[in-house]
Amino acid sequence: MSEATPAGGAYPRVDMSNGGSTAFPALEENVLKYWEKDGTFNESVASREGNEEYVFYDGPPFANGLPHYGHLLTGYVKDIVPRYQTMQGKKVARVFGWDCHGLPAELEAEKQLGIKDRAGIEEMGMRSFNEYCATSVLRYTDEWKEYVTRQARWVDFDNGYKTMDPGFMESVMWAFKTLYDKGLIYQGFRVLPYSWAEHTPLSNQETRLDDSYKMRQDPTITVTFPITGATEGTASVKTLAEHPELADAAFIGWTTTPWTTPANLALAVNPEVTYAAVRIGDDAAGADGAEGMYGKTVVLADDLRGAYAKELGEKAEVLGTFTGAELEGMTYEPLFGYFAERAGEKASAGEGSEGGEGNQRKPGAFRVLCADYVTTADGTGVVHQAPAFGEDDMFTCEAAGIDLEIPVDMDGKFTSLAPEYQGQLVFDANKAIIKDLKAAGRVLRHQTIEHSYPHSWRSGEPLIYMALPSWFVAVTKFRDRMVELNHEQIEWMPSHIRDGQFGKWLEGARDWNISRNRYWGAPIPVWVSDSEEYPRMDVYGSLEELERDFGRKPASLHRPDIDELTRPNPDDPTGKSTMRRVPEVLDCWFESGSMPFAQKHYPFENKEWFDTHSPADFIVEYSGQTRGWFYTMHVLSTALFDRPAFKKVVAHGIVLGDDGLKMSKSKGNYPNVNEVFDRDGSDAMRWFLMSSPILRGGNLIVTEQGIREGVRQAMLPMWNAYSFLRLYASQPAQYDTSSTNVLDRYILAKLRDTVQGVSDALDNTDIATACDEIRWFCDALTNWYVRRSRDRFWAGDAVHPEAFNTLYTVLETLCRAAAPLLPMTTEVIWRGLTGERSVHLADFPKSENLPADAELVTAMDAVRAVSSATSSLRKAHKLRNRLPLPKLTVALPNASALEDFTKIIADEVNVKQVELTEDVAQVGGFEVVVNARVAGPRLGKDVQRVIKAVKSGNYTVDDAGVVTADGIELQDGEFTRKLVAAEPEHTAEVSGQDGLVVLDTQTTPELEAEGWAADRVRGLQEARKAADLQISDRIHLTLSVPAEKEEWARTHADSIAKEVLATDVKVVVGEQLSHDVADDCSADIVVASVAS
């Protein structure tokens, strides 16, 4: 038996298990206690004082709810990058912040207080409500701190900021005033997404946030608008005169929002589209009462007649066609009489006249307008215009001089302007409106559709679009500059977001509605005169300016204190009017976007620092923030400073439950975070999340098995290597890279490559690749280096100090390289090895301090790949590893580079002979086979071209295995690689080496005997352990075997004796002895000499 007695005792230099459990969760708890007591985090920042700073923005969460997996994922990234940059010598402040204002805070407070609507807030009182909000938003700060701390995330809570802090709010005031002075803020009346449930408009980007669009069933109707005449001076006068068939015709228009029809004031057609006047056949089928439509003439886009074939009937007759431009100015009968007085007055020239030149009116409502946005993609090509409820409608009607009417109040209910529906929520009124329109014979079609519809991102109620007065940032004025800065100065991961998800959003950016009709938020710092006779508006950007004009500072910048600041209007000579603050507060996204400068109370403090440390070096959040925080920061930084807010951004994907769906507490489709921490530890969770595709923009399914992979891939290999060193080291090893042993040289050179790879990856914030580098190295360390070096370690550090020094050097360096990725596991190992204060106070290793040997690394990696491929063949043929085989043929393009390693290969895969050849083609190869069924839908007719190219050999396969045939790159699943070899069942591909191995599996009695003996050695070693022998105890061995195996046993008795430390071996036949060795063998073991 070659293994010696473990010496041990040299390690750990510091025992972070405190003599207790060495399970990872228990060790992590000890690390966290140590860091808190030691002040390690503060020291890591203070020790870099005066060095170059690395600026990182930590997006502020709300503390009125508990953290979830999304926060966990982002938090790990926010910890890894600063840890790495700190170890690279930079000072990295990690200030934690809290979002406090806005709808999320108000709605949670309402929920806690049992308030159901705005009236409840008014009854409670604005001051009391806001005071409650101020407390509520920090309700879960302790839980957040515990959560963040448990995940080993280092942040500065003590010096953190809150968006409700006076300093932060004053900086926000400054931003508003600065934008206003630049002409980039204005008050306008626009159609906006409006939440009737929350009584406030929202911004366009808020309607693009997660969960904002939901599937919803709504009624759709196609209604008639009977033509009544023409508007004087328009093309329709001539059209009506030349086409008498239009005299009794009606336009038909389609809408998915029947509740908007009481506010209809116009119709829109496309001037370039051809429209048809169609007489409905008597075989038509339509909505209830549609039989009353038989023989009537309707006007719709000619291309859409087929979409209404059922309602028009097979006997329908086209009476004439016209362009939209020829229809412009035609007047029609309103659907409802609510605003009938808005129709144009009859023109004097048309009074009493006949035909097309009669029935003329002056321009007014209820006429046809031309608009380029009208299409024939759906509907009828005639669009009903309700300018109070549609942005395009509003612009079109404004241009035509048609003022809007708003028959809906701030509760989303009809007002007295639509008396039949007064008090009804607009969505609830749909049913009654459709019923009334049917009774009037105006409905041609009535259906129900399921469509994606915007909902409030907080309350979940469906939004309406409604014309409202609001304050806007004029984003369209500097949109091109935003696009330019994004393209030229921001690095995205994944890179496609720059010109894709984010870039396209910027290109279509609209003016940003920043006012909210709410209570708890930063005030819009605008005061206006309450007199229309003496108008005046003042905008303020600081507390000092407020004190200058109002003679005092407000008790706080929140409502109602800020609202109480009033003063006489300086422009009113009568002294009767007063300057009062406008009631709105700012969109909380405006505050989040102000975070880079507002957290520093810029420009009132830290001006020089911010001016020289902006943009930030790095930020991270999930990809949906391209519509949220990423966007608002970019808007404000571009407008205020003409520079981006950040240089580099990671936009990660979404964490999904184990069923591939959104995480849900009710479904229980994800493992409890605290249970994972208790069972596997935070480092395991960190590794699972950080090594996944989610950081490259993909989504990730969280499973318990996946999390445990983190333990298997990196934590256990590192720990096992450290434990191996602890077990056998009798004295502390040294940092030494001078060993000439080939395995030592390999692992040190491999470590050099790994350190460089991790550094390159983390420099690029490519954390998943950094994890790959560590994982690959851990495999080489434990599954190759330590295993192949066991004999040297068993011999002890007095005999092979170079092995112990090398392993110490590797572990010490690996701990520093992996510290940002596995902060607690590496802390335990590193302190155990070195006895020093913390691995996180050390410098990141430099690859140039390790020996380079590219040829050796390449050759040994090939040896490992050959061994792995051979092992897979053994498994396929169910040939146990201890059974020697006659021959292995290794066919590689650079096989000659392995000549010095054939003994290692032979020993590793247990073959008697290793033959090398560089003629791979003679052994076999791979054919590419195109999967036409999969590739066909994507490639279309090109699939045949690809198949032909592959069959003729006109294709390439790159290092990543990507196949390109005749210039067309094939995707995963569109092809397979088929092994073609003389002995395919004995041949395997050598991964990553463009080669093959061929294993001769023919055995001989001699080989069988040798394998049989090796199996018995294994059984005897287990028997020694069962007998509680020391590793170095020598024994007298009696081995009982079947008669047919007696010759094998006697032939290999000496080799068996050597392996199990037997001074002598007695072979007997057919006896049952005290220790079972195998199915057919037993043994008696008597100690010959006891180890001292």
From Swiss-Prot:
Residues binding ATP: 665
Entry-linked Pfam families: Anticodon_1, DUF5915, tRNA-synt_1
Classification via InterPro entries: aa-tRNA-synth_I_CS, aa-tRNA-synth_Ia, Anticodon_Ile_ABEc, Ile-tRNA-ligase, Ile-tRNA-ligase_type2, M/V/L/I-tRNA-synth_anticd-bd, Rossmann-like_a/b/a_fold, tRNAsynth_Ia_anticodon-bd
Signal peptide: none
EC number: 6.1.1.5
Superkingdom to which the source organism belongs: Bacteria
Keyword Lipid metabolism: no
Names of the cofactor(s): Zn(2+)
Function: Catalyzes the attachment of isoleucine to tRNA(Ile). As IleRS can inadvertently accommodate and process structurally similar amino acids such as valine, to avoid such errors it has two additional distinct tRNA(Ile)-dependent editing activities. One activity is designated as 'pretransfer' editing and involves the hydrolysis of activated Val-AMP. The other activity is designated 'posttransfer' editing and involves deacylation of mischarged Val-tRNA(Ile).
Family: Belongs to the class-I aminoacyl-tRNA synthetase family. IleS type 2 subfamily.
Name of the protein this chain belongs to: Isoleucine--tRNA ligase
